Amino acid sequence: MADLRAQDDARRGVLSLTREEMEAVALEGRQVAGPLGRETALRVLREGELVVVGRLLSASNATFFGLVEERGSDGRPGIVASCVYKPIRGERPLRDFPDGTLACREVAAHAVSEASGWDLIPPTVMRDGPFGEGMAQLWMEVDESVDMMVVVGDDSPALRRMAVMDAVLNNADRKGGHLLPLSDGRILGVDNGLCFAVEPKLRTVLWQWRGLPLDDQEVAVVAHLGELMETSLGEQLGELLTPAEVAATTRRIDGLLRHRRFPLPDPNRPAVPWPPF
């Protein structure tokens, strides 16, 4: 971590710029691609050249804003996309999660989101980068007109799906600031590193459906996840998590199907992350 901070000090001039200004400096006249399809985004994130532009100083772990550029077979510039890059070397030790595992958990959370068909987490991959292996996630432009401090308590289908997903993921850190409202009405969840603990740790600001029945579509999606845990999804998670964490995910899915209700807060531990935003 010390070497990351030392190298980061050299970028202080860049870090004082806005995200748009950082992007303009790095692009040197090139254009960031518009909205990308899922497969294209994942390919560019995995295979494109990753350039760190600046550090996002509000994050607790080393988190960088970067650009990934896919080059053609002739070496010419291709698609350029903005991303968030979180190197494993920059993860702060935590008391209740193993060291160096947060990036894998973020990628695993995206895998579950993809399997659900709900598209709740931006495209996310594991890859090498300037500071070593880590997580790269497609940068999402938010709708600045939406105040999540107001919206987070709404009874909206988008937030309700997120609450179901977080119950499957055992998300211990669903803050309001980890929800990104997009201009097309979707709400995506980011900063999903504190997921998949074996013991119950659900901490979220989305408790408005606590104890209520899951609807038929939610039950169907959770059941589909359960089926995929026996095949492709289970294999994906097995490459990113421990066997105990994969088994615990299956148990959470089974529990949701058995009770067919949103979970209740545990009175013996904090139910809301701090700070909540």
Protein language model features and the residues they cover:
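Short low-complexity stretches enriched in small and charged residues
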Residues: 21, 31-36, 91-95, 142-147, ...
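Short loop/turn hinge sites at secondary-structure boundaries
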Residues: 38-43, 47-54, 170, 258-270
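Conserved ATP-binding subdomain of kinase catalytic cores across diverse folds
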Residues: 43-154, 159-172, 176-177, 182-192, ...
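Juxta-kinase regulatory segment immediately upstream of eukaryotic protein kinase catalytic domains
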Residues: 2-45
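C-terminal catalytic region of ATP-dependent kinase domains
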Residues: 3-10, 98, 182-277
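Short, flexible coil/linker elements and helix-boundary hinge sites characteristic
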Residues: 13, 29, 173, 260-261
